[in-house]
UniProtKB/Swiss-Prot annotation:
Gene Ontology MF, one: potassium ion transmembrane transporter activity
Domain RCK C-terminal: from-to ranges: 141-223
Reported function: Part of a potassium transport system.
Name of the protein this chain belongs to: Trk system potassium uptake protein TrkA homolog
Gene for this chain: trkA
Record: residues binding NAD(+): G7, A8, G9, R10, I11, E30, D51, T73, G74, R98
Sequence ranges assigned to domain RCK N-terminal in this UniProt record: 1-122
Annotated domain remarks: The RCK N-terminal domain binds NAD and possibly other effectors. This is expected to cause a conformation change that regulates potassium transport.
A GO cellular-component term linked to this record: plasma membrane
SUPFAM superfamilies: NAD(P)-binding Rossmann-fold domains, TrkA C-terminal domain-like
PROSITE patterns membership: RCK_C, RCK_N
Keyword field: Ion transport, NAD, Potassium, Potassium transport, Transport
InterPro entries per the UniProt record, alphabetical: K_uptake_TrkA, NAD(P)-bd_dom_sf, RCK_C, RCK_C_sf, RCK_N, Trk_Ktr_HKT_K-transport
Length: 227
C-alpha cells in the first residue's frame, strides 16, 4: 500500500516507521522545516515540507494514487480539512482522522454527511485513557483494546503452577463472552484451538473477551494449582 501521513509528530513518526517495517510505501507531509529535515533521517519514504490542507502539496505527494491518507497532527481543524480535501482529490482513498477531543469522535462516526469523508476516526487520547483505566481496574496481563466492540484481546502466560495447565479448553468453564483464539507452546508453536486442545504446561494463551467477562477470565487463567 501507498500511505500518506500528515504530521511528523510522535504518533505520525511511529506509524510511518511501523508501516515501512511491514513493507508499505509511506510519504510524510510536515509543515515544520526542521522537523521535516529531522524525520527524513529516520524514514526511507518521501518527506514533504508543506501544508496538507493545500491541494498542491497533496498533489505533490501523489494523493490520486495513494491507498490511504492519515491526518495525525494535534490540530483537529487541520486534520478535518485535509481529510475532506484528500477525499475530494481521490474519492477511493481511505482516510484516517485523528481527533484530540474524544467528545467529538462520536459526531464524526454517526453523522452521515461527515462519515463519507472519514473512514476511520481515532482518538489516541481516548485510547490511552481507556488503556490506563482498564489496566488499573483489571491489572496483570498484556492487552489490545477494541473500544468500539467493548472488548479486548488479552494474553496470559501459562506455567506448571497454573491450574489450567494440562487441561483441555472445554473443561476450563470460561465465560460465554470469551473465546480462546490462539495457544502457543513453550517452543512458540501456534495452535488454533478447539475444545479438545490441551493448555500447555508452559506457553501463552490468547483470549478474546468482552469487558464484562474480563474479571472471570482473569480468575480462571491466573488461578494457581493447589498443593
Amino acid at each position: 500500500m501507498y500511505i500518506i501521513i500528515m504530521g511528523a509528530g510522535r504518533i505520525g513518526t511511529l506509524v510511518a516507521r511501523m508501516l515501512e517495517s511491514e513493507g508499505h510505501d509511506v510519504a510524510i507531509i510536515e509543515m515544520n522545516r526542521e522537523r521535516a529535515r529531522e524525520i527524513s533521517e529516520y524514514v526511507s519514504g518521501l518527506v514533504i515540507e508543506g501544508d496538507a490542507t493545500d491541494q498542491k502539496v497533496l498533489e505533490n505527494a501523489n494523493i490520486k494514487n495513494a491507498d490511504a491518507f492519515a491526518a495525525l497532527t494535534g490540530r483537529d481543524d487541520a486534520n478535518i480539512l485535509a481529510c475532506i480535501l484528500a477525499k475530494h482529490l481521490n474519492p477511493k482513498i481511505m482516510t484516517i482522522l485523528r481527533i484530540t477531543d474524544p467528545g467529538k469522535k462520536k459526531i464524526f462516526e454517526e453523522v452521515k454527511e461527515l462519515k463519507r469523508y472519514f473512514d476511520i476516526v481515532v482518538s489516541p487520547e481516548d485510547i490511552a485513557a481507556n488503556y490506563i483505566f482498564r489496566t488499573l481496574v483489571t491489572p496483570g496481563f498484556d492487552r489490545v483494546l477494541l473500544p468500539r466492540e467493548g472488548a479486548e484481546i488479552i494474553q496470559f502466560q501459562v506455567n506448571e503452577d497454573c491450574e489450567v495447565a494440562g487441561k483441555p479448553i472445554k473443561e476450563l468453564n470460561l465465560p460465554k463472552d470469551s473465546l480462546i483464539i490462539a495457544v502457543y507452546d513453550e517452543k512458540g508453536n501456534l495452535v488454533i484451538p478447539s475444545g479438545d486442545t490441551v493448555i500447555p504446561k508452559k506457553g501463552q494463551v490468547i483470549i478474546f473477551a468482552k469487558n464484562s467477562a474480563l474479571q472471570d477470565v482473569k480468575k480462571i487463567m491466573e488461578k494457581k494449582r493447589e498443593e
